[in-house]
Amino acid sequence: MDNDRSTVINIGGMDFELILTTRATKEIGKRYGGLGNLGDKLMKAENFEMALDEIIWLITLLANQAILIHNLRHKDAPKALLTEDDVELLTTPLDLTAYKASITEAMFKGTKRNVESEGPSKNTGTA
């Protein structure tokens, strides 16, 4: 996958790429009302269990984007999607806390804009 767009986490001894795609952005928008509301929702989770559920949902969503891309490109060798139950069973609450930085990095990479400057314009002549 493209390292400029993804970050890697280890879940249960297996590496998973987290990637923010347009599809993931739409799902986040449905759940939180937009990317801007995501941080507020995570910080204002009413209880510890709810906060864990939100992080697990996000990890599953972002990790499955890379799997879905793989499956699209390799129809002859599809990989199984990660489930929220898988993430719950293969992680500890401490792992989930550590994954927050990776989630943030994946979100940043997914929304990063590369601005390229052009050379001097042909129309900038000295008069």
State where each predicted segment sits.
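Residue-level signal for threonine
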Residues: 21
